[in-house]
């Protein structure tokens, strides 16, 4: 990412091989296999802004992260949870599902975990 602005004229797109396995639900696998290199400059700026403003987040937060995610760093959930000021926060760790985990074989499990987390957060707020 740091050299994206210099690379953009010579390498217009950052691309990767589409994942070919049973991790994603085929009916919903409309993922992308690349993005414009110049967008990486914006992405880097947005990540920096987001990290600097995590302290403003006070609502319940459940981070969902997979060991199979090749897009984000393994410490991303920890960075987020350490930065937010939420009273109610947690992490749902998945194994071997890709970045777009909501359309993976874990989709139903994620939906159930989110429902449980936010119901418990609401009950906690009422108490």
Question: Model-derived features: where do they sit?
Answer:
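Short beta-strand/loop motif that positions the catalytic acidic residue
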Residues: 57, 63-65, 69
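Short, conserved loop/helix-junction motifs that constitute active-site signature segments
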Residues: 54-58, 83-86
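Short glycine/proline- and acidic residue-enriched helix-loop micro-motifs
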Residues: 21-34
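Catalytic active-site module of serine/aspartate enzymes centered on a nucleophile-bearing elbow/loop
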Residues: 90-127
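Active-site nucleophile elbow and catalytic-triad environment of alpha/beta-hydrolase enzymes
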Residues: 36-53
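Conserved alpha/beta-hydrolase "acid-adjacent" motif
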Residues: 70-76
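Flexible "cap/lid" loop of the alpha/beta hydrolase fold
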Residues: 1-11
